[in-house]
């Protein structure tokens, strides 16, 4: 199998792609950038000697550097061009975070493995350690080989970015090298296949080759008879792109695809795809294959519910005989019992992941509820846009103007109130003065009323009409006296104590009463009235 990025057929192999022995490219066709007599052959010999099987490893078509090439369990990786020195700031930060994780883990004295980080949900640390490389990720390549599975061809390749696997392939030198000539893939495949087959038939390398084949069959990476790839180069479409069946992704990407699709249907399609492509149906069901598969998964830290057979598309395979297809269909019927359990295991994994997310959300909500109100920032405040801020600023300015106008009105009202209070005070003072004057008069009048005496004046003689006048009112009025039943005329007056002169007018004539004292004043005789 081979994975080539989308583009013309002259495109190069991804550095994370797995290349079978019969699909190893002849590097001399890549142009003058690489030395075909030294570097290309060195890469091929290195892969053969280490692997000793049909899988030669991971190959990157780039100039090799002395400080940037590492070997681990038959896998050759090419490091990126960026500097990964121990004194870099990112390395120190990464080591600090790993140390904090070890302190909070169940085994503080043991360096965490990839399985421990994934179980704790620290996918960010896994990604950073893989990018950093070096001793931090030492031994992880063993787990990655067992975790790599194949995805259903119904999923489009655009869902997973191919550019992530080729970070440094956009340089002008690489583009110039890759555009040089057309690759004769069929001739290179045949020549490389014959060279590898001659060394994989006997000795320890032959035993390792057979064990590797059985492991690949148990993991869904099946190899056809005579060491040929399962449509590795036949999977290349006419336009140069690689079908989705030849893509290799990690277990975490498979989990994301399983979350968006039906777990039961997806597990069934993957299982049937793996069984239908196998050229040797008996190997996948043999006890040796199951034992090797169980040992590999336990060594990588996966259980049966976390690791399933890879999915291989049968649409890109050519040259498969009809009798092999019939045998594969029989093997597919034997695996129906495991399909149901696999779908249930996928559902359990998805439910566990969902429960962990809900638990983290619940803990964040509880933390926000327990924190002081002034430190809690609501989502509404965080989502306030610049337009809303401008509107709030305008509203604030409008409210400030209203407050200023209200304050001015309040000040004017207070001034008017002060003037009114002054007027009221003046009016109160005047009223109090008038009241005091009136009270003084009332007191004087009351005292005068207390001094008044009632005086009764009588005219005993007969007459028809009798009037009374005197000095008690300055001789200004003539008061008519009342006639009683017995013919006596009388009149009551209230006078202050003293002496008064009075005189009667009887039927129009001025007369004095001979029974009262008589005084002469100015030649006139008047009666004297004394009030004691």
Curated annotation (Swiss-Prot):
Record keywords, A-Z: Chloroplast, Coiled coil, Membrane, Plastid, Starch biosynthesis, Thylakoid, Transit peptide
Family annotation (Pfam families): AMPK1_CBM
Function: Involved in starch granule initiation in leaf chloroplasts. Binds and delivers suitable maltooligosaccharide substrates to starch synthase 4 (SS4).
Gene: PTST2
Record-level GO cellular component terms: chloroplast; chloroplast thylakoid membrane
Organism: Arabidopsis thaliana
Region Disordered, residue ranges: 165-201, 256-292, 314-347, 367-388
Molecular function GO labels: maltoheptaose binding; polysaccharide binding
Effect of residue 475 to A: Loss of glucan-binding in vitro
Protein name: Protein PTST homolog 2, chloroplastic
Chain segments annotated as coiled-coil in the UniProt record: 389-454
């Amino acid at each position: 199998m081979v994975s080539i990025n989308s583009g013309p057929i002259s495109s190069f192999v991804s550095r994370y792609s797995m290349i079978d022995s019969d699909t190893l490219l002849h590097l001399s066709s890549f142009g003058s950038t690489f030395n075909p007599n030294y570097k290309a052959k060195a890469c091929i010999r290195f892969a053969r000697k280490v692997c000793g099987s049909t899988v030669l490893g991971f190959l990157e078509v780039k100039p090799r550097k002395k400080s940037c090439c590492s070997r681990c369990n038959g896998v050759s990786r090419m490091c990126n061009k960026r500097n990964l020195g121990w004194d870099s700031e990112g390395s120190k930060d990464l080591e600090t975070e790993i140390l904090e994780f070890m302190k909070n883990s169940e085994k503080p004295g043991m360096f965490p493995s990839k399985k421990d980080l994934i179980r704790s949900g620290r996918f960010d640390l896994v990604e950073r350690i893989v990018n950093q490389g070096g001793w931090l990720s030492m031994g992880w390549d063993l787990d990655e080989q067992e975790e790599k599975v194949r995805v259903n061809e119904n999923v489009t390749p655009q869902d997973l970015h191919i550019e992530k696997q080729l970070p440094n392939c956009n340089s002008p030198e690489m583009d110039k090298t890759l555009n040089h000539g057309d690759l004769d893939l069929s001739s290179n495949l045949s020549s490389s296949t014959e060279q590898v087959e001659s060394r994989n038939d006997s000795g320890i390398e032959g035993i390792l080759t057979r064990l590797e084949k059985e492991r690949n069959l148990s993991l869904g990476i099946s190899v056809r008879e005579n060491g040929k790839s399962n449509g590795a180069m036949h999977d290349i479409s006419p336009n140069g792109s690689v079908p989705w069946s030849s893509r290799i992704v990690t277990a975490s990407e498979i989990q994301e695809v399983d979350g968006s699709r039906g777990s039961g249907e997806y597990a069934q399609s993957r299982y049937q795809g793996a069984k239908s492509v196998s050229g040797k149906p008996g190997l996948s069901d043999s006890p040796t294959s199951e034992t090797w598969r169980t040992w590999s998964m336990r060594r990588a830290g996966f259980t049966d519910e976390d690791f399933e057979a890879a999915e291989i598309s049968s649409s890109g395979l050519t040259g498969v005989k009809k009798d092999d297809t019939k045998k594969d269909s029989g093997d597919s019927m034997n695996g129906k019992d495991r399909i149901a359990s696999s779908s249930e295991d996928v559902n359990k994994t998805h439910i566990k992941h969902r429960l962990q997310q809900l638990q983290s959300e619940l803990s964040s909500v509880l933390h926000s509820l327990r924190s002081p109100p002034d430190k809690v920032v609501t989502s509404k405040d965080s989502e306030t846009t610049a337009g809303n801020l401008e509107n709030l600023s305008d509203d604030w300015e409008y409210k400030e103007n209203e407050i200023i106008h209200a304050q001015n009105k309040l000040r004017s009202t207070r001034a008017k109130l002060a003037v009114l209070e002054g007027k009221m005070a003046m009016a109160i003072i005047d009223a109090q003065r008038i009241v005091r004057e009136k009270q003084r008069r009332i007191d004087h009048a009351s005292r005068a009323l207390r001094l008044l005496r009632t005086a009764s004046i009588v005219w005993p003689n007969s007459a028809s009409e009798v009037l009374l006048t005197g000095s008690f009112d300055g001789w200004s009025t003539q008061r008519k006296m009342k006639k009683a039943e017995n013919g006596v005329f009388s009149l009551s007056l209230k006078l202050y104590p003293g002496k008064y002169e009075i005189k009667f007018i009887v039927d129009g004539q001025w007369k004095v009463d001979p029974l009262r004292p008589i005084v002469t004043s100015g030649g006139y005789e008047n009666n004297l009235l004394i009030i004691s």
